[in-house]
Amino acid sequence: GLLFNDKIEQLFETGATLGAGFIFTGIILMLAENAGKKERDLEKMKVSDPLLIGTAQAVAMLPAVSRSGMTISSALALGIERKTAADFSFLLSIPAILAAVVLDVYKMVKTGENALAAIGTAPLVLGMLFAAVAGFFAVKTMLKLIQNRKLKYFSWYLWGLGALVLLDQLVLHIFF
């Protein structure tokens, strides 16, 4: 992340990369859904499994590429059972999110930016609460999709969303 941060941030400047990221995530989810048997639990994971899953997590630094989608899909593709794949993905999110927060705080301190003063405490707290509630329901929904072998529906949603974003970016220019 630190090594390619500037290049990755440039990718967020255009909506076309968002559309491509949504479509890419949908493809990865569909491939993982259709991958072979998923029978290995945490005790049967190989030493290489976390390294491969962590590498997939790094791909999610790209715009609109889902971190949990990448980690869960890579675990499923490696033959790890669905519940273990989801649990491992959410455990991996802790250091990734903490690292992102530390990096953002460092940038704010370095540049002298004071988001708290600029935005205010109440909107920040309210935003955090809404994000936590939305995140909780998103995680619950994702776990149900994983357990019920219905990632294909989420893939279709991502393909449609990606197509709409690309259509807007390349033709309509309503949002971008």
Locate each region found by the language model.
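Multi-pass membrane proteins that catalyze or facilitate reactions on polyprenyl-/lipid-phosphate substrates
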Residues: 1-176
